[in-house]
């Protein structure tokens, strides 16, 4: 089932956040043949869209007027409904300390501009696959935990019922 969903990549939603129309156009050209893509030209709009749309992945520029990419990821990670969305920084900032800060704030990857379209596609696919597999694993754990609790409750009920049959004719067994 996982491979079927991953092969249907257009089922996944990506939010691209960048204040430069040229960068948005490039990323749209790379991603839209494969994914459903929404665009936000500012950090504030990105947060609004993310709350309504809950994307599977966010590509986020760092240097933007108003809320920076660092501000946006902090807000995303502090919101329980949005904190599991993978965020990939796509930025012209190529310094090691910028990358380090991005990872410390919760980014899953970091792509420097100018971008390589095959690299962007590969990284997006990888992180969507990982996030999808994590969701599927969490669902399976919940399902198995519920089954285990049901079995445990059934065993307790059977033991309680067996206690009612404890009499002198059975040697108190």
Language model: regions and residue ranges:
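Non-catalytic signal-transmission and effector/linker regions of two-component phosphorelay proteins
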Residues: 1-15
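Alpha4 helix (beta4-alpha4-beta5 surface) of REC/receiver domains from two-component response regulators
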Residues: 25, 52, 71, 83, ...
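Short amphipathic alpha-helix used as the core "switch/output" element in two-component signaling
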Residues: 48, 70-83
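Receiver (REC) domain active-site loop signature in two-component systems and cognate sites
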Residues: 64
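C-terminal output helix
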Residues: 97, 111-124, 128
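Amphipathic alpha-helical coiled-coil "transmission" helices that mediate dimerization
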Residues: 122, 129-157, 161, 165-168, ...
